[in-house]
Amino acid sequence: MNLEQLIGRLKKTPSFMENVTHWETIPAKEASFAPFPAELDNRLPPVLAQRGVYKLYSHQREAFDLAATGKDICVVTPTASGKTMCYNLPVLNAILKNNDARALYLFPTKALSADQVSELYELIEAMDVDVKTFTYDGDTPAAARRQVRQAGHIVVTNPDMLHSGILPHHTKWVKLFENLKYVVIDEIHAYRGVFGSNLANVIRRLTRLCRFYGSDPQFICCSATIANPGELASTLIGRPVEVIDKSGAASGEKHIVFYNPPVVNKQLGVRKSVLQETLRISSMLVDNDISTIVFGKSRLTVEVLTRHLKERVKDPFGNAGRVRGYRG
């Protein structure tokens, strides 16, 4: 049974539908493409073509064009729409055209930076060019830090390390601050409350130091879909931004279902365990060979779900390899 058939069956199942409070269907969308810009370094298109990228999504091209005009931008498009390319292309293009150019990437967590930067490493290795990319965080060995400060074209770090490990020691980072062309801030929706206000102050210290050393970097911010991305980005960096919120990536049909676990005690209003219902529904999907991602609120929840789900979907030989747990 494929996903479409399973959805049709669930819609006809009263015991399931009586617990659904809302069901929204978002139709599929065709991709919108744009050619590579003429300003793009000629070493990039062949490498992208090797990865199956022969043209850009419209929002990726818009991001490149706005960056080329010197504007600060904020990209707000769905997951898996190619946001990473929106900042990697302008950054790599600038460094390939001027080997002195530098870029600073900020991610809220070390795990996220490791995931996102892997694509950047692959592009650089495929081009076989001398663009040195380093991660600079608490795990960076002391012996490697001098090389990062002196030779790093792209420095990948987090707000805490920027605050405590880079800005106070700016005299050791002269090469970076004198030539800083781009500052990339990914996942800006994570910077809210005290965390967000702290980052805003750190960014103001960063821009003040850049002015002292004679540079004026552009900011490229990326965010998940939120109500006020432009306002948030402008508040964080202290400057107006151009918002790119129309994704050119294709998307399949989506079903958004709000589901309440069934009531097991009407007098007390007690409902069935969320964990048990999650296991039941996800087992149904896995049994029908439908690729599924289940999110838990904590690491413990993920571990419990993974263990029980593996028990439910074991084949006759005891193999539960179709189910894997993932933690950042």
Q: What are the residue ranges of the model-derived segments?
A:
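Helicase motor core with emphasis on the C-terminal RecA-like subdomain
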Residues: 4-51, 55-58, 62, 68-81, ...
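Walker A/P-loop
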Residues: 84
